[in-house]
């Protein structure tokens, strides 16, 4: 075992096919272990999305493994526990028979997760908690900045070093605004919220960024549901939305951004508001790195350090929209959006409409079903109590993989007035918009 290293250099001196370029398709390191059958005591996967992306959900894996030899014992110097690493990769598969009479096994990729916590619960049992790639973004810092670029370029900067898939139409859109210093997860959330994208990692090893589907892709009948856990909840009525749009322009005046006594060494100084990076100047130290939200300064002699520069000027406008078809006795319940700093004035109206459209879907249906080919963000039609139909988006699936291919599901949508016989296989005939 090799420990305490920062990098490994591989030098290839020869190949078995002279005259051809060497191609390295991947690199696996450490022990490759497969657990299946009785070795997997518990396996729970939580998949969740937010259709508006006002938050990026983190999918999780909770796993308990059995090993008769005690290889996962913390106290075993020759065991596997000693080589486990934070962010260790887990790839999960579920083998399922298509029906009770079938002998053919179908393997479903349940996603890729990265180890966050683990513990020994006995001599033979070990419990693991892992998160998806969005969970990794939550611990990855991002310096932010002021932008006037395309969505594709900004996503590439935020997700540098991460595998992702971005819808081509979204990538070509223009985006402008400001991102503060924060995590890459928060930065990606701001982008997705501004442009109307869904972000999801389920059943994949990549971060997928795409517009939410608008057409129905499946029907969940009562026969696929288990009898326990069915519930329909009416969500609060939202009567309107107020969206603050932001615009940033470089100021012309040089201002004092920072002033304090610093000891010798290299210091990172963060600003309370964005500044033009090229305008930064330092006295009392040497400027070694600069950005919109920060600068790094090296001080050789302890003393006063002053940073000056030109601030960006923020101007805001507020757009207000009211929901349509409100009941006459509706009490005001207005949502406010104030901190979406990538929402420029030209994007405010579309964002407000998306929010009202989503919150017009007031029927939240939770149930347990035999899982199939459905994935998060699918637009589904669900048969509910009394044969009523709810058309909505699949927002959550929670799997118990050791108890069969079962999933606890949440679908949020609206009641359909048409019967099931009108279902065409893709959409309901005569279907109208929500708002």
Language-model features, listed with the residues they occupy:
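Assembly/oligomerization scaffold segments
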Residues: 1-147, 177-179, 185, 190-196, ...
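A generic structural signal for residues embedded in beta-strands
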Residues: 92, 382-383
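N-terminal export/assembly leaders
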Residues: 138, 154-180
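Viral virion structural and adsorption modules
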Residues: 208, 394-399, 403, 416-435
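Extracytoplasmic/secreted envelope proteins and their assembly/folding machinery
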Residues: 152-156, 185-188
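Surface-exposed, non-catalytic interaction/assembly patches
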Residues: 28-47, 51, 138-149, 188-189, ...
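Loop/turn positions that initiate beta-strands
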Residues: 87, 376-380
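Short, well-structured beta-strand/strand-turn elements
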Residues: 162-170, 193-208
């Amino acid at each position: 075992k090799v420990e305490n290293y920062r990098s490994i250099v591989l030098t290839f001196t020869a190949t078995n096919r002279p005259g051809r370029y060497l191609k390295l398709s991947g690199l696996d390191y450490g022990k490759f272990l497969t657990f299946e059958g009785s070795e997997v005591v518990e396996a729970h996967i939580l998949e969740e999305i937010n259709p508006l992306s006002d938050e990026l959900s983190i999918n999780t894996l909770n796993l308990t493994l059995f090993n008769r030899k005690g290889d996962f014992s913390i106290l075993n110097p020759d065991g596997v526990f000693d080589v486990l690493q934070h962010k260790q990769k887990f790839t999960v598969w579920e083998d399922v028979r298509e029906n009770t009479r079938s002998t053919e096994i179908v393997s479903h990729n349940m996603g890729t997760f990265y180890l966050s916590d683990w513990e020994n619960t006995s001599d033979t049992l070990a419990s693991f908690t892992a998160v998806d790639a969005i969970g990794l973004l939550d611990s990855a810092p991002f310096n932010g900045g002021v932008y006037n670029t395309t969505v594709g370029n900004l996503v590439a900067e935020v997700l540098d070093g991460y595998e992702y898939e971005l819808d081509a139409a979204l990538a070509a859109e223009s985006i402008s605004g400001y991102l503060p210093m924060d995590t890459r997860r928060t930065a990606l959330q701001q982008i997705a919220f501004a442009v109307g994208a869904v972000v999801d990692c389920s059943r994949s090893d990549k971060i997928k960024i795409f517009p939410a589907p608008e057409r129905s892709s499946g029907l969940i009948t009562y026969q696929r549901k288990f009898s326990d856990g069915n519930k329909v909840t009416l969500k609060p009525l939202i009567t309107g939305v107020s969206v603050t749009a932001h615009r940033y322009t470089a100021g012309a005046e040089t201002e004092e951004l920072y002033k304090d006594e610093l000891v010798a060494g290299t210091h990172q100084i963060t600003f309370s508001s964005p500044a033009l990076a090229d305008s930064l100047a330092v006295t009392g130290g040497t400027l070694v790195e600069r950005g919109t939200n920060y600068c790094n300064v090296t001080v050789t002699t302890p003393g006063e350090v002053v940073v000056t520069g030109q601030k960006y000027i923020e101007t805001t406008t507020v757009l207000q929209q009211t929901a349509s078809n409100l009941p006459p006795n509706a009490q005001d319940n207005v949502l406010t959006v104030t901190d979406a700093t990538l929402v420029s004035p030209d994007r405010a109206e579309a964002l407000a409409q998306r929010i009202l459209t989503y919150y017009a879907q007031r029927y939240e249906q939770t149930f347990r079903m035999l899982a199939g080919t459905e994935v998060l963000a699918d637009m589904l039609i669900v048969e509910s109590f009394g044969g009523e139909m709810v058309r909505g988006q699949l927002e959550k699936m929670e799997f118990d993989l050791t108890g069969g291919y079962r999933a606890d599901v949440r679908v949020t949508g609206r009641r359909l007035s048409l019967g099931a016989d009108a279902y065409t296989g893709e959409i309901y005939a005569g279907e109208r918009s929500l708002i």
